[in-house]
């Protein structure tokens, strides 16, 4: 099979997202679409935190926070480590931190009426 120079071995044009990327991005955005999960991720943009700290930060009930954190962990968005009897959570990477920050910036611009920008 002959591939044009504008496509890779899988037939994708470089720089153009393919179906798997769109599907995974949609799953990620769906997880961010929940107010409590978004608040938890935002709290983690400041650094590591345990369930008690995260519960206080987002204002949800502790069982709900634990369930949301479990979903985020299973999705690979947060990491955990043990510190004595406590479990400490952290964002997996800076991409997620920037995505959360940008989502909140868009919301802030819409609520404040400030002009959009690049």
Language-model-detected regions and their locations in the chain:
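Residues within the DNA-recognition helix of helix-turn-helix
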Residues: 68
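Beta-hairpin "wing" of winged helix-turn-helix
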Residues: 73-83, 90
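Residue-level detector of secondary-structure transition/capping positions
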Residues: 48-49, 73, 104
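Amphipathic alpha-helical dimerization/coiled-coil segments
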Residues: 1-24, 42, 93-118
């Amino acid at each position: 099979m002959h591939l044009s120079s504008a496509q890779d071995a899988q037939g994708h044009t470089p720089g153009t997202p393919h179906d798997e990327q769109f599907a995974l991005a949609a799953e990620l955005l769906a997880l961010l679409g929940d107010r409590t999960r978004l608040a938890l991720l935002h709290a983690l943009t400041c650094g590591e935190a345990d369930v008690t700290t995260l519960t206080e930060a987002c204002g949800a009930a502790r069982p709900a926070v634990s369930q949301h954190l479990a979903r985020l962990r299973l999705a690979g968005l947060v990491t955990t480590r043990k510190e004595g009897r406590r479990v400490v959570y952290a964002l997996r990477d800076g991409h997620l931190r920037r995505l959360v920050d940008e989502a909140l910036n868009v919301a802030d611009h819409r609520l404040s009426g400030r002009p959009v920008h690049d």
